């Protein structure tokens, strides 16, 4: 019996990356990836003069298999909401949509990854415009350079060459203090810290430097709540009680 194969034109990448609703949503997806990799922190550095966004974590990095998974559209090996434990730290999985590399493409055309795992350093980069011009991207090969390195080197660094429009939009969003603080408060966990730095403007935000939620707008605060997904319990507090 004759068979046919599914093919996907490169314009699909452009369309999917544009459907990511906002630059803040895209950054949140990248923050989730660092959290799920058990990094103690993530640093987002925005360099307007260079049109570069750098996202750095100290997580467990990516193996060859995990790099392959990164480019599997809408497919994730993670189970959202499930507890995972690594080196005595337990976290609840945040990412599951398979949006890792599409989120990076929200900001620009060229993205470079550098990741360390088990004494190996892997470097690879992708140019979105090269993919978009392909008639069929299902068989596109992405070169990955892997070298031995010290096992003390860990984590992943993503370098994005941002286009002017997306950089301008991102800076406009983060110019509002409340929005910048909301970004670094995307995940509240004592074992994880989110750093945001905007070069040229000497702007720096960090989860560790935020006020506690219960201390925000105390005079106007009606109540606040705490929820435990483990106990499946909601606690309401008024005036600290």
Segments from the language model and where they lie:
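ATP-binding catalytic core of ATPases
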Residues: 137-203
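GHKL/Bergerat-fold ATPase module in large chromosome/replication-associated machines
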Residues: 195-241
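Short polybasic amphipathic segments
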Residues: 110-113, 125, 191-201, 223
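Generic alpha-helical secondary structure signal
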Residues: 65-68, 174-177, 211
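GHKL (Bergerat-fold) ATPase N-terminal catalytic module, capturing the glycine-rich phosphate-binding loop
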Residues: 1-162, 167
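Generic hydrophobic, helix-prone segments enriched in Leu/Val/Ile
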Residues: 16, 170-171, 187, 222-225, ...
């Amino acid at each position: 019996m004759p068979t046919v194969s599914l093919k996907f034109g490169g314009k699909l990448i452009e369309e999917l990356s544009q459907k990511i609703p906002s630059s803040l949503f895209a950054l949140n997806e990248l923050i989730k990836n660092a959290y799920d990799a058990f990094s103690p922190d993530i640093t987002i550095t925005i360099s307007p003069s260079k049109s570069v966004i750098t996202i750095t974590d100290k997580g467990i990095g990516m193996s060859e298999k995990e790099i392959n998974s990164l480019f599997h559209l809408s497919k994730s090996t993670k189970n959202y909401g499930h507890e995972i434990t690594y080196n005595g730290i337990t976290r609840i999985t945040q990412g599951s949509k398979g949006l890792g590399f599409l989120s990076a493409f929200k900001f620009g055309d060229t993205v470079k990854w550098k990741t360390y795992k088990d004494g190996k350093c892997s470097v690879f980069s992708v140019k979105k415009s090269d993919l978009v011009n392909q008639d069929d991207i299902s068989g596109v090969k992405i070169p990955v350079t892997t070298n031995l390195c010290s096992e003390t080197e860990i984590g992943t660094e993503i370098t994005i060459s941002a286009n002017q429009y997306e950089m301008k939009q991102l800076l406009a969003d983060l110019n509002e203090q409340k929005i910048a603080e909301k970004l670094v408060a995307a995940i509240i966990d004592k074992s994880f810290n989110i750093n945001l730095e905007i070069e040229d403007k000497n702007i720096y935000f960090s989860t560790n430097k935020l006020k506690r939620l219960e201390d925000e707008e105390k005079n106007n605060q009606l109540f606040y709540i705490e929820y435990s997904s483990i106990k499946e319990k909601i606690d309401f507090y008024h005036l600290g009680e």
